[in-house]
Regions:
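Short, T/G/N/S-enriched strand-turn elements that build extracellular solenoid repeat scaffolds
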Residues: 1-13, 17-22, 27-42, 47-61, ...
């Protein structure tokens, strides 16, 4: 059955041990902040976090959809008990402080929305498809391992110094999407295509950066004291 919790649950320093939710076909909504060691998403229902979450982990045990409201943050890791399960929808600016999944058990999809929003993934992210659905900014302060990073609108991705991206980078429309390397990074897979090129790539600020596969962009800016290596066509 559906459930709605209107008041804050727990408090910092006095967290609940566990919350079990997301029964098949159900919708569970938390209207305020939630403090719990573990938020278990047990089946393929829907969970709406309209407040902040603080705990040890959010645990995808099945193909749950997790909706995170704009301007709300997740101060925990997010784990998955199987590969290619779970979807995270982010409505606007959000900070996720912990790792998102792992290399063996990737989240099925993460979808960022909210025009002009600015979100940060503070640690490593493992996902099948990472979709940027509006003109927004995503700061990747950890590594990204994914099948696809999809620029579905003219979004911007900032990859932190010393972090790497192992994902095919796609843009839905030619001349949309900006990828900024803020230091030394390795981009493992192809960036763009000959018909749908990214708008811009910037690199070279510091350190050594390497693009291991083909790169297609309308503009590539190399500016700074770093070295940029292209192993394939530019």
């Amino acid at each position: 059955k559906n459930a709605e919790f209107k008041q804050q649950i727990g408090e910092d320093g006095k967290k609940l041990k566990e919350i079990n939710t997301s029964k098949s076909g159900s919708t569970t909504t938390f209207q305020n902040d939630v403090y719990a060691q573990n938020l278990n998403l047990d089946e393929d229902g829907i969970v709406n976090l309209n407040g902040n979450f603080k705990g040890d982990k959010i645990d995808f045990k099945d193909n749950t959809t997790l909706n995170i409201a704009a301007d709300k943050n997740i101060t925990s890791s997010i784990v998955s008990q199987d590969d290619n399960i779970g979807q995270i929808n982010i409505a606007g600016s959000t900070i996720i402080s912990g790792d998102i999944a792992d290399s063996l058990n990737k989240i099925r999809a993460i979808k960022l929305n909210g025009r002009n929003s600015n979100s940060t993934f503070a640690n490593d992210t493992y996902v099948k498809d990472l979709d940027l659905n509006e003109k927004l900014t995503l700061n990747l302060d950890g590594n990204l391992e994914a099948n696809n990073l999809n620029f579905n609108k003219d979004a911007t991705v900032n990859l932190a110094d010393g972090k790497n991206m192992d994902a095919k980078v796609n843009t839905l429309n030619n001349n949309e999407g900006t990828l900024n390397l803020l230091g030394g990074s390795t981009i493992v897979k192809e960036v763009g295509t000959d018909t749908n090129r990214l708008k811009e790539i910037t690199a070279g600020k510091s350190g050594d950066s390497t693009f291991n596969d083909k790169v297609y962009a309308q503009k590539t800016t190399i500016n700074g004291n770093g070295d940029v290596n292209f192993q394939e066509n530019l």
